[in-house]
Amino acid sequence: MEQGFQVLLQVFGGLALFLYGTDSLCRAVQQGVGRRLRSLLARCTANPVAGLLTGAAVTAVLQSSSAVTVMVIAFLAAGLLQLRQAVPVVFGANIGTTVTAQLLAFRVESWRYLLLFCGVLLCLACKNWRGRCVGEAVFGFGLLFEGVTVMRSAMEPLLQSPLLRLELARVQQSPLHGLLAGVCMTLTVQSSSATVALLQSMAAQPGADGVHSLLGLTAAIPILLGDNIGTTVTAVLAAIGQGRDAKRVAAAHAIFNLSGAAVCCALLQPFAALVRLCSPTGAECAVIARQIANAHTLFNGLCALVWLPLTGQMVRLVCALLPDKNRPKERL
């Protein structure tokens, strides 16, 4: 019992390091180049493609789609962006957030101690605030990877729990069970990047034969889709008390993820086959972290590919769902 409690503490400790590292990285980047990023968001949204690419790039730098979505909502409230400009940026933010999963699948956490050392060194050695911001960002990256390493080392004994194995068996039998598990995980942690990292760590544990994953790709995908749905709650919370357009962009974010998750769940086997086609071959437990990262990127990329040409229709849809006060609802 005591050993199980210690293992749980290790998992939560690793998760805390991951979240703090992500937050430190995001804050350091915002302090260092935040004004330029905000200027980039305001200027580079002339057309939907530019907005998509800008959203993806800014999110990849900040390592937080929630931060970009909240920034977009603030710009809408301030009148710096129009709704038609903001929606593609949110689509791009969903793509940019997949960078973390791809980095973790490359196992670059082996550089974590060097990143931590260089980050602290820069913070101590640099006299100007910009150099210290770079140091804090590098340190945040190192802390992020250290958190993942701690979670991975804790997963092996944790997965010996009969209760957890029973839950994993339920997830494998029911995609809906996995979807709800992913939503609950992200609602609890408030970070889809953290829950995807946790999923990668859990899925990479080998089964009884030492070849297959304990979870499997078709069981991991619904959890991943749930993670993507859960992250829309942050935008909804940020839109509370804001103007009508802020609520509409939060609704567009939710529709983007919900519609994509519904289609992928309905076409689970073909989607899993596409992911395997785009991923390296080998023992399942050795390649599943990459498969999950690729599934994350494919899901958001394909959703953006479908919805980007329909930006106008999305804007009309959210305006119809959330009409201006004292105005009748628009017809779709």
Label each PLM-derived region with a short phrase.
Residues 148, 152-171, 214, 238-332:
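Transmembrane alpha-helical segments and their short flanking loops
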Residues 5, 82-90, 102-152, 168:
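Signature of multi-pass transmembrane helix bundles
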Residues 2-48, 138-184, 202, 212-213:
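Helix-loop-helix hairpins and the membrane-proximal interhelical loops
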Residues 11-23, 55-59, 117-126, 140-150, ...:
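Hydrophobic core segments of alpha-helical transmembrane domains in multi-pass membrane transport
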Residues 59-62, 68-96, 103-111, 119, ...:
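Membrane-interfacial helix-loop connectors
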Residues 20, 24-32, 36, 40, ...:
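Membrane-spanning helices that line or support transport/gating and their immediate boundary helices
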Residues 15, 35, 39, 43, ...:
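Alpha-helical transmembrane segments of multi-pass membrane proteins, especially transporters
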